[in-house]
């Protein structure tokens, strides 16, 4: 089998492996209580180029799209609106599983939140970022569903681009607001992508296509 064919056939598992290795590398540093250079650089970039009286309310607004209240409400709305209840159930179970996984990882690693600069107050542990991890899993799964089921190319790709921007913006907002390190957000994204590969494969096999 040629390398190109191997990559095409196993692309999702390659992505899972790369993201998982990246997450574990960050988690190891977090476990040893290290503040990484990327944490300092990430915050300096955001504080230098983004923080202002104009952008702070925007960051506060955007971060709500990764919060529990909004995601639960959106899940209920989608479950009601989507005719295929198996898909609706898969959206609900995705939110539940990723939330439990996030809390499990937080309690294992127990990284304190940043204290130097806070625009808003948050409780609980810092790594991996719950908003980032859950948003990547939730909106990432919606991106997958849109790609798979939406026929109109304009609607499909516009939705995918907007949701991708939203995921990144939620992650940036957590650093901006001073409640997470850069590595918290990156770690949340990486483990969530790995999780999504497994979740989508399992849901397709045991629920949607059953």
Feature roles, as predicted:
Residues 23, 27, 55, 101, ...:
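Alpha-helical membrane-inserting segments
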Residues 17-21, 72, 91, 95-99, ...:
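Alpha-helical transmembrane spans of integral membrane proteins, capturing the lipid-embedded, hydrophobic core
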Residues 21-26, 97-104, 165-174:
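Aromatic-anchored segments of alpha-helical transmembrane domains
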Residues 2-11, 82-93, 158:
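Membrane-interface helix-loop-helix junctions at transmembrane boundaries of multi-pass membrane enzymes
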Residues 1-68, 107-109, 113-119:
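N-terminal transmembrane-helix/juxtamembrane module of multi-pass inner/ER membrane proteins
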Residues 32-33, 83-84, 107-115, 179, ...:
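Transmembrane helix-loop junctions in multipass membrane proteins, especially transporters and channels
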Residues 36-37, 80-152:
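Membrane-interface loops
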Residues 3, 7, 118-210:
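Membrane-embedded catalytic cores of phosphoryl/pyrophosphoryl-handling enzymes
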